[in-house]
Regions:
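S-adenosyl-L-methionine-dependent nucleic acid methyltransferase catalytic domains
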Residues: 1-114
């Protein structure tokens, strides 16, 4: 295999599983999370904005938010757009929910952490 060909992509890691589980229309060409994650981390820095002009069910904006970026997407299909908004809201809620270890880190004095 060529060094520039990504052969370690998990083809099943897409939003179509969520679509099917929710009884919603599956996307014809789902993007794999591994491909999107790699592109986002290679070409953007945390806090930057990632734009997807053909967002579909929102994989790129969703993964951008999950990776600490801002995600923006445009979509013509109202059904896909509604699904994408739901995924993004859920991811924002997940990211805003504190974890036990995060709370401990926030409350522990710096000297005690050493």
């Amino acid at each position: 295999p060529h060094d520039d060909v990504w052969t370690d992509v998990a083809r099943m890691r897409t939003l179509n599983g969520e679509q099917q589980a929710g009884g919603r229309e599956m996307h014809l060409c789902p993007l794999q999370f591994d491909i999107v994650d790699r592109a986002i981390t290679q070409f953007t820095m945390p806090g930057e904005t990632v734009l997807d002009p053909f967002a579909g069910i929102g994989t790129v904006p969703l993964r951008a938010v999950a990776l600490g970026r801002r995600g923006v997407g445009f979509e013509l299909s109202p059904r896909y757009w509604r699904d994408a908004v739901a995924y993004l809201r859920a991811e924002e809620d997940r990211a805003a929910t504190p974890t036990l270890f995060g709370l401990l880190d926030a409350t522990m004095p710096a000297a005690a952490a050493e």
